[in-house]
A protein has these predicted regions:
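Short amphipathic alpha-helical segments
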Residues: 18-20, 42-43, 75-78, 105-109, ...
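A generic "binding-loop/recognition-motif" signal
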Residues: 34, 69, 142
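Short low-complexity, flexible loop/linker segments enriched in glycine and/or proline
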Residues: 44-46, 65, 81, 133-137
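Rossmann-fold NAD(P) dinucleotide-binding segment
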Residues: 53-117
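NAD(P)+-binding Rossmann beta1-loop-alpha1 motif at the extreme N-terminus of oxidoreductases
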Residues: 1-58, 62-65, 91, 97, ...
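Rossmann-fold dinucleotide-binding core
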Residues: 99-157
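Hydrophobic alpha-helical segments typical of transmembrane helices
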Residues: 17, 37, 52, 72, ...
Length: 157
């Protein structure tokens, strides 16, 4: 099953994670604050580059974020060009950031209000785990969207 996926945040963890999703046959669009890094990723993995998180999320079935902290997460989700502005109804948003429980609850409520699902999915395994596609993912959220997202999450875990 090939899906339309967006991945926001191409740091030492996100870059290879998004790569594994692409290698599994999914159509991946990436966004990174440093556009040159996104362009490098797109060339390496044959993906697409978006100018904003909002553009990346548009029409995606699954939206992933892997950013630095709560403030970065708020910016890419709820900010002026955040993904919550364009995430389509029925899509599933998976956050791999190690963030606070408060922001996870906030994003869950906001996603529900906009008609899409949210999974809080922090990761463990470090850069080596990300590069090897063997991360441990601890997912919190509703079971039905988890079951739908699990095959995509499995690409990097």
């Amino acid at each position: 099953m090939s899906c339309k996926v967006s991945f926001i945040g191409l740091g030492v963890m996100g870059y290879p994670m998004a790569g594994y999703i692409s290698k599994a046959g999914h159509n991946v669009t990436v966004y990174n604050r440093t556009k040159a890094k996104a362009e490098k990723w797109a060339k390496e993995y044959k993906g697409n580059v978006a100018d904003t998180p909002m553009d990346a999320a548009k029409d995606s079935d699954f939206i992933f974020t892997c950013v630095g902290n709560d403030n970065d997460l708020r910016e890419v989700t709820l900010g002026d060009k955040g993904l919550f502005k364009t995430a389509k109804k029925g899509s599933i948003y998976i956050d791999n950031t190690t963030a606070s429980a408060n922001i996870a609850r906030e994003l869950y409520k906001e996603a529900k209000a906009k008609g899409f699902d949210f999974l809080d999915a922090p990761i463990s395994g470090g850069q080596a785990g990300a590069e090897g596609g063997i991360l441990t993912v601890m997912v919190g959220g509703d079971e039905a969207p988890f079951k739908k997202a699990e095959p995509v999450i499995d690409c990097y875990s």
